[in-house]
């Protein structure tokens, strides 16, 4: 599996200028600081929606792609219609049939979706795609990638009806995950995320 980042649409100068417009300040037309990006991403103020990412997962299993299609942002998959492809009969196609998935979510969409898909209760195969995307996005937008965290880290505790206890076990390993400071909690999670990938 490999996430291919095709394009980042919008830019941080626009986000900064949109924020300034809401308080009747003139645009600056410049890239904001890393500190500003981190703060606005954690605050989840509406100007962050001006930036989106177009990405592709090639040959993803159909059933995994359908987990992603349940989220409400632009996405496309290969047609399975028999008059559009000849790889298999649509009526006979297995759930594991490979398709290409193209996504086009904005920042807010990814924050909301990845909270669910990085969760340890999500299908492990689907979670691996979430992790791969987070890692690929980091090369283009590190501050954005860093706010993609599981719901338990986002909330500071597990909200699931059937708690998997992952968060509690991770807090035992790294108490900073229980911090009431959101940036501290996210930094602790991201440190663990990157250590697990090496």
PLM regions: where:
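Family-specific signature for flavin-dependent thymidylate synthase
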Residues: 1-198
């Amino acid at each position: 599996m490999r996430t291919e980042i095709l394009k980042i649409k919008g830019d941080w100068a626009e986000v900064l200028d949109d924020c300034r417009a809401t308080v009747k300040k003139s645009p600056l037309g410049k890239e904001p600081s890393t500190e500003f990006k981190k703060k606005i991403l954690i605050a989840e103020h509406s100007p962050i929606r001006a930036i989106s990412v177009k990405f592709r997962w090639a040959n993803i299993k159909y059933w995994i792609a359908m987990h992603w299609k349940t989220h409400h942002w632009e996405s496309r998959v290969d047609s399975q219609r028999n008059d559009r492809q000849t790889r298999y009969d649509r009526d006979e196609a297995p759930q594991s049939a490979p398709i290409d998935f193209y996504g086009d979510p904005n920042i807010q969409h990814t924050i909301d979706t990845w909270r669910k898909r990085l969760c340890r209760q999500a299908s492990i195969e689907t979670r691996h795609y979430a992790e791969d995307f987070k890692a690929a996005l980091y090369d283009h937008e590190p501050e954005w990638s860093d706010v993609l965290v599981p719901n338990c880290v986002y909330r500071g505790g597990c909200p699931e009806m059937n708690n998997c206890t992952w968060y509690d076990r991770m807090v035992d390993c790294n108490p900073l995950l229980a911090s009431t400071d959101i940036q501290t909690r996210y930094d602790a999670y991201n440190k663990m995320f990157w250590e697990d990938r090496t």
